[in-house]
Amino acid sequence: MKRYLIFGAIGPCVGGFLMLYATTVASGYWTETNWAEISKFLGAYIKTLQYTYLFGIVPALMVGAIDDILYHVNRIPFAMRLLIVGAIGFAAASLYGSRAPDSGAMQFVLNGIVGLVPAMLSSWLAHLYADEPQPVHSA
């Protein structure tokens, strides 16, 4: 259950931050970066955090379930599991982001990173704190 708590707590928070950053960059809002713009950005992030969890908790838990399934497959090492979960997060976020009016390579990458980074970060944290140590067997 620690794995799902990690994915549910970390995933939407990081994904929402990256989604706000991606839409800010894509809209051309940050032509000049100064402390006033950064404070407005962080204020908007804090104000929209509740909606980030509202819309992000279910996809984060779904990716957490995929990570849990891959954890129980003994032949998949941690690094491969991390890459698979990241690729699934990237693909899911890219497909969801393709519904936006803008399209192109930059939109594809920015929307994909919104799913890639939280999925890989949550999987790594779950590996550190939720996975039981595996016994080492001699041949």
Residue positions per predicted region:
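Juxtamembrane/disordered regions of integral membrane proteins
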Residues: 1-139
